[in-house]
Amino acid sequence: HLTLPGYREMDKARDAARKRPIGTTGRGIGTTYSMKSERDGIRLADLDWDEKWNDLDDADKKFLEQFKDKLISMRVNIAAKMYEFRNDNILFEGAQGAMLDLDSGTYPYVSSGASCSAGAATGSGIGPKALDKIYGVFKAYETRVGNGPMPSEFNADTEGELCDYVRNTGNEFGVTTGRPRRCGYLDLVALRYACHVNSIDNLVLTHLDIYDDMNEIEACVAYDIDGKIVTDFPASIPDLNKAKPVLQKFDGWKADITKCTSYKKLPKAARNYVEFIEDFTGTKVGIVSVGADRNQTFVREKIWK
């Protein structure tokens, strides 16, 4: 499905009209999905379908006219192509986060599409049984863009300095909007939930080096909701809004791990932290990253057959 210029304005107007704005990026994605569900959208496959073309808004039609022939020449039958390469190694990379999935995320503060692992099948023309392994990529801390519950978010009044450090060191600013991302402690309750609903085989931990200068680090291991300790991720937005993080402390390592050449050479405190994540989520951390370069990524579990 194609996202057209007019969809952007519709996206912004719809969010502004909401009593509780979601905080959309205003790129027209939500409108594209809405048009798809209402069966009013236009697909790449429809560009030479005159009846569908004539349904377009004049401004969008004029814009699309510039690229129509080029786009038509680039079309392929994705389902057929996927079947052709069925015996090859193919990597599907999802966008956004598990908690923004339309069905299993923090609805209504979610994206309009399937950002869970199941979306790799529905969006690519293959069946779910064709997915051999599912990797879940996460940061060593929590981030969120836009509105919605985030129980482990740093408190602006008491943890503002920590928040600024994590945000600036991790370069946590929206790619589309440039606005600062909300940052917080790693939420292991949410991470475990994401592992369950996405059938994660292995986790991929990134930005571990963010903690290099800290004497101790903390992670959220439960929620305090009205005085009750909750260890399962709630489905209720009111519960999530009331949730206070129950934090567990870990020893820091006070060392520059970006220069480590293997996982085994990481400080023991760093390895202990990784292994706690594994125990808590019940999921192996198969890859650990301590920097942006390829040689700063340690593969602990074989990826391809």
Predicted regions located by residue number:
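Non-transmembrane, aqueous-exposed alpha-helical and coiled segments at domain scale
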Residues: 1-305
